[in-house]
Amino acid sequence: MKLKRFFSAFLAAALLAGTVPAALAADIDSHWSKPYVTSLHELGIINPSASTGNYTPEASVTRWEFMRYINRAFDFTEKASISFSDVKSSDMYYETIQIAVKHGYINGTGNNKMDPEGTLTREQAATILGRLHKYAPTASASKLDVFTDKSKISSYATSYVAEAVSQGYIN
């Protein structure tokens, strides 16, 4: 459980930092995420950007990129059959999604879609982390008072976001 908490905290930091390809680059030298990015790279969870060699710490993370990070962090490899209308077997992220679905930490977005290239939201990340921990969130919804956009948090994610705040994964 401690290992899961460790990786979940790092993955949450990666989400907050944005897309985090790892290679020593000047664009991250003074960025708050540098120690997290460095650790994730050393653990083999993230790779350098082949095209730029930069970290781009303020860029967004897609849903499939976050799934890839989680699959690597937890060494998930077992696959499920999937049939999302927006995911084809020839897509580069097909196996990543098969693995994520098999391990039960992500669902589609409704209407038989996965939206793999969509930007991962805070509520989606919190829900994924909660499902990875397999906990029943117990944190009070008052934990969400720190967010000016709390009214925009989907009902399915409210308890997971509150728990992620309580656990210190997001703030």
Q: Where do the PLM segments sit?
A:
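Feature responds to low-complexity, polar/acidic, surface-exposed segments characteristic
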Residues: 2-36, 42-96, 102-124, 129-158, ...
